[in-house]
C-alpha cells in the first residue's frame, strides 16, 4: 500500500562509521544525514570536495585493466584497498565509482562490486566502520536503486541517468522545465518508487 507507507517509511539515510545500537556514544552523532539515498551532483561534490567531509570519504574506482587482472583479482584488489582506507586512513564513507573509466579499462558491474565489498567487510569485522556509496551509470530506475540499497549501499548517485534527464529537458523546450527541475523530478520519482 504505497499511499499509506509514506506515513511510516522514510528515505532518510546516514553515512559514516556506525557504533553499537545498544551503546550510545559521541561517534553516533557524527554521521552525515541525507534526506534521500539518491545523491545529486551537488551532494556528491560535497562528499568528495567539501572541507568537512572530504577527509571522511574516498573514491574507489570499479574499473580494471583486463590485461593486468581477471575479474576475481580486480574484486580482491578493490576489497583490499577499501580495507586499507578504513583501517589505516580512517575513511568512513567509501564511494565505489565507475565514472572515470579510461578507454583501456573495463567496468565491473556495480552490484557485483557492491555485494563483494559488503560481504568482504562483514567477514573482516569492519562493515560498521564505513558506509558504501555507489556512483554508477547502471542505475536507471527505482528497481536498480532498490537492488543497490538491498546489496548494502547507503546512497547512490545515478549520474548518467541524471545527465540524460538534463539533456532531455534542454532538447524539449516546450516542456518549460529547467534542467535542475527535471533532475529534481527524476529524483522524486525514484524516491517514490523506492
Residue map of PLM features:
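Phosphate/diphosphate-binding loops
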Residues: 116-194
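A broadly tuned "polar low-complexity/structure-edge" signature
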Residues: 7-9, 13-16, 58, 115, ...
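Alpha-helix initiation/capping motif
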Residues: 1, 40, 103-109, 141, ...
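Conserved structured catalytic cores and adjacent interaction surfaces
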Residues: 56, 67-73, 77, 83-144, ...
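Flexible loop/turn segments at secondary-structure boundaries
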Residues: 6-7, 15-17, 66-69, 101-105, ...
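Generic amphipathic alpha-helical segments used as scaffolds and interaction surfaces in large
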Residues: 62-73, 104, 177, 181-185
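A short small-residue
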Residues: 60-62, 95-97, 170-176
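Extended, highly charged accessory segments
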Residues: 1-78, 83, 87, 95
